[in-house]
Regions:
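Phosphate-backbone binding interfaces of nucleic-acid-interacting proteins
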Residues: 1-216, 355, 372-374, 378, ...
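A carboxyl-terminal module marker
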Residues: 2, 450-457, 467, 543, ...
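Short, hydrophobic beta-strand segments
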Residues: 3-9, 174-183, 236-244, 378-385, ...
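Glycine/proline-enriched, intrinsically flexible loops and inter-domain linkers
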Residues: 5, 11, 24, 64, ...
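Conserved mixed alpha/beta core segments that line enzyme active sites in large multi-domain catalysts
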Residues: 48-78, 257, 268, 274-346
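Mobile "lid/hinge" segments at catalytic clefts and subdomain interfaces of large enzymes
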Residues: 125-134, 138-140, 149-154, 168, ...
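Terminal amphipathic helices with adjacent charged low-complexity linkers/tails
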Residues: 203-229, 407-435, 442
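Extended, well-folded interaction surfaces typified by the phenylalanyl-tRNA synthetase beta subunit core
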Residues: 428-594, 737, 790-792, 802-823
Length: 823
């Protein structure tokens, strides 16, 4: 949005105000000005001159000698190579000492590149030249914005241009233009009237809005045209008027200048008037050739499946059912609503009657269509931010008035107006004290009311209680904090004293759920795992690749209506799909080892489609592959195995104070049935872990052994023991023994440890499996398992004899289970 200060000055009294100071104040008060542009910057001393005569240069065929009247006593002589000059033409002249811009640069603010060129008098092939005549480009003017002027050679000005006047007085080159950086919530400021109201409120200046009236003539529009809304949720208001006896031509210079200040190219008086009203009032309009609209009827509806339209740019567009269109009486799309008109109903030089549209469309719908079609415009941008329905009638009457004043059209009697649900003014109730407390000042109520009324709020006050009616054009306000912000910014943020916020310091604490999650995370990180964060979405196709059988509860996933990607159409019911994608990505990047985990919510609906909020709970899952050891350390190259993952899970339970759990074979389908386990307590599975099933690895294209785990947090919550265990530092030394056992292959480690602990007595302090072997040197049907046993007494030093007795007792107990010492 650009704001011409010349134009703004016709709406609000800003005479004598410094443009730079004004821009700074607007920015501080929440209406940010990105750049202050001076279109004529770089042009100095360039005046208009009339060519009196043109002669050929005696020594150069490509040069011409021109005598010009520049408003001085004597004509001046300028030598030029331009071939388009003739006697009687008015041209811009840069005489000696004048400055012209170095170049035009569309990427620079205002299109002007820094630096200029100073003109000096001189000689061309022996003939004196007092300066130069200028082309459009040499004045730094964007040729695209001046379609009526010649773009080649010297700029030829209109015949009625006075002689000897500064070029700044033409085409508003003496204007100052603000390039605004408005936030999307301030949709009201995307118009000159909105900016005038805001400027008047901030600077306490009088605002004079245009007086709008229409001189209606001829037969009424009813019965000759109609407008309809098929879905009121997507079109809040639809106004229509009929212009007759239209004369297509150029717009007045002042309208063209104001359009150019916003970078809009003048086209013809009808299109220019529509663009002008959009800039002035903020309501986009669309014009149709009345005689080309079938049935003279316009209907706002959603596009049909497979429907197409040729837009004004000549491109055929494929529409989809989410796009809004304006259809004619034959139900054919005549316009992509709020985005671009149709080619078949375009206003041309032959147009005699124009059907006007002033409508308010759904912001989200216009945004989707605009992005999908790649069509962004001033109109679609305004619709995306929100349009006030009350401005529709004002805008359509304004364009009629402008064209009537130009003698370019007459307006048929009456206005078509479909307005299904009229907008009601928003009322906010609050108090002076609440607003003051929110801002942190003590403003008198009279001053507060004055500020609100300057912003066009209607205020009723009684004993400090305020009933505030929000103006219809402020769509961004909804409650007391918004009112407080309005008061604060107009009062001036710089006037609010800086204070240090006060608050009582209270001891913070985590909830039990937070504490459990923190402890699990801390334990996993301490064991060398890295936390990852994936999307809360998944694709149910990945569940099959994880070996989950059809009918498993993880398939009961909530579909997402508007997924961010086709790869994530469902809410996740397990963390494993996201982790598997992370793991495969790491493998593709040649990362040969990784230990990762994720914590997060999963979503389990009771039924689909949803009738109530789904069950949402926390899980932990992780995956490990490669070597846990860093290069240069002992055991370098050792790969993760089942006992690593088991130890990690045991450490988690230890961190939570959970004891007396059982270990069972896992039935979790993701894991290898023979190399996996569950920790179970009170009939609840606390965690499942093990090596990933070979079928899973094959489906994901992984050729390494991968170990994983799933921790069911809800099952743990009521088992966490907050008791802090304390044991004294031992006074007496321990005695250690190693047992190398020949164990039947069907025996589990858990069964062996249970026998040893029962036989070992109360002085057996620790028991640790440190070696497991099956191979050629071990009897068939058996495996070798080696344990380290630590014995200690609290009241004395144990003798070797005592320890040997317990070892004999343990060996006898093991023998009953066919477990013997290795020879």
């Amino acid at each position: 949005m650009n704001v011409s200060l010349k134009w703004l000055g016709t709406l609000v009294d800003i005479k004598g105000m410094n443009p730079d100071d004004m821009a700074e104040t607007l920015t501080v008060d929440g209406i940010p000005v990105e750049h202050v542009i001076r279109p004529g910057e770089g042009i100095k001393g360039v005046i208009t001159g009339k060519i009196l005569s043109v002669e050929k240069h005696p020594d150069a065929d490509h040069l011409l000698i021109c005598q010009l009247d520049v408003g001085e006593e004597e004509p001046v002589q300028i030598v030029t190579s331009a071939s388009n000059v003739k006697a009687g033409q008015i041209v811009p002249c840069a005489l000696s000492g004048a400055h012209v811009p170095a170049a035009h640069d569309n990427k620079a603010p205002g299109g002007l590149r820094h630096g200029d060129i100073k003109i000096k008098a001189g000689k061309l092939r022996g003939v004196k030249s007092a300066g130069m005549m200028c082309s459009l480009g040499e004045l730094g003017m964007d040729a695209n914005l001046f379609p009526a002027l010649n773009h080649e050679g010297i700029l030829i000005l209109p015949e009625d241009t006075p002689v000897g006047v500064d070029i700044h007085n033409l085409y508003d080159l003496d204007d100052v233009v603000y390039e605004m950086e408005l936030t999307a919530n301030r949709a009201d400021c995307f118009s000159m009237i909105g900016m005038a109201l805001e400027t008047g409120a901030i600077f306490r200046k009088k605002v004079t809005l245009p007086s709008i009236s229409v001189k209606e003539e001829g037969a009424p529009i009813e019965g000759r045209a109609s407008v309809h809304i098929s879905e009121p949720a997507y079109c809040k208001r639809f106004c229509g008027r009929l212009l007759e006896n239209v004369k297509i031509g150029r717009s007045p210079e002042w309208i063209e200048d104001r359009l150019r200040s916003n970078g809009i190219r003048p086209i013809n008086n009808v299109v220019d008037a529509a663009n002008y009203v959009m800039l002035e009032i903020g309501q986009p309009l669309h014009t149709y050739d009345y005689d080309k609209v079938a049935g003279h009827s316009l209907t706002c509806r959603h596009a049909h499946e497979g429907e197409k339209i040729v837009t004004l740019d000549g491109q055929e567009r494929q529409l989809n059912p989410s796009d809004l269109v304006i259809a004619d009486g034959d139900d054919k799309a005549a316009c992509v609503a709020g985005v671009m008109g149709g080619f078949d109903s375009e206003v041309t030089a032959e147009t005699k009657n124009v059907l006007l549209e002033s409508a308010v469309f759904d912001s989200a719908s216009i945004r989707r269509t605009s992005r999908r079609l790649g069509l962004r415009s001033e109109a679609s941008g305004r619709y995306e931010k929100g349009i006030n329905p009350a401005r529709s009638e004002m805008a359509i009457n304004r364009i009629c008035q402008l064209l009537e004043e130009q003698g370019a059209a007459t307006t048929a009697k009456g206005m078509l107006d479909e307005y299904p649900v009229k907008a009601k003014p928003q009322i906010i109730k609050t108090t002076v004290k609440r607003i003051n407390d929110y801002i942190g000042i003590n403003m008198p109520k009279e001053q507060m009311i004055e500020i609100l009324e300057a912003l066009y709020f209607k205020v009723e006050e009684q004993d400090g209680n305020l009933t505030v009616t929000v103006p219809e054009f402020r769509l961004d306000l909804s409650g007391m904090p918004d009112l407080a912000e309005e008061v604060a910014r107009v009062y001036g943020y710089k006037n609010i004293p800086i204070t240090t916020p006060w608050s009582a310091i209270a001891k913070g604490a985590m909830s039990k759920d937070q504490d459990v999650i923190f402890r699990i995370t801390d334990s996993l990180v301490a064991d060398g795992l890295s936390e990852v964060v994936n999307y809360s979405f998944m694709d149910k196709k990945d569940l099959e690749k994880l070996n989950f059988p059809w009918g498993h509860k993880v398939y009961n996933a909530i579909p997402i209506m508007n997924p961010i990607s086709e790869e994530y159409p469902d809410m996740r019911t397990t963390l494993l799909p996201g982790l598997m994608h992370t793991l495969t990505y790491n493998l593709s990047q040649k990362n040969e080892e990784a230990a990762i985990f994720e914590s997060g919510h999963v979503y389990q609906p009771k039924e689909l489609p949803l009738t109530e909020l789904p069950y949402e709970y926390e899980l932990f899952s992780g995956l490990l592959y490669g070597s846990p050891d860093e290069a240069g350390y002992p055991n370098n190259g050792r790969k993760y195995d089942f006992f690593d993952i088991k130890a990690i899970m045991e450490n988690v339970l230890k961190a939570l104070g959970i004891r007396d759990y059982e270990i069972r074979r896992s039935t979790y389908p993701v894991f290898h049935p023979g190399i996996s386990a569950d920790f179970v307590k009170d009939g609840k599975t606390l965690m499942s872990f093990g090596q990933l099933h070979p079928a899973v690895l094959d489906k994901w294209g992984i050729k390494k052994e991968v170990y994983g785990f799933v921790i069911f947090v809800p099952h743990l919550m009521n088992m966490v023991d907050e008791t802090i265990d304390y044991s004294r530092i031992p006074k007496f030394p321990a005695s250690q023994r190693d047992l190398s056992l020949l164990v039947p292959a069907h025996c589990t480690n858990d069964e062996v440890e249970e026998i040893i602990r029962k036989a070992g007595g109360k002085h057996l302090e620790t028991l640790r499996l440190f070696d497991l072997y099956q191979g050629e040197q071990v009897k068939e049907g058996c495996k070798s398992m080696a344990y380290n046993l630590t014995f200690r007494a609290e009241d004395r030093t144990l003798t070797d004899k005592e320890v040997d007795q317990w070892i004999e007792k343990i060996v006898k107990a093991l023998g009953k289970a066919d477990i013997t010492l290795r020879a």
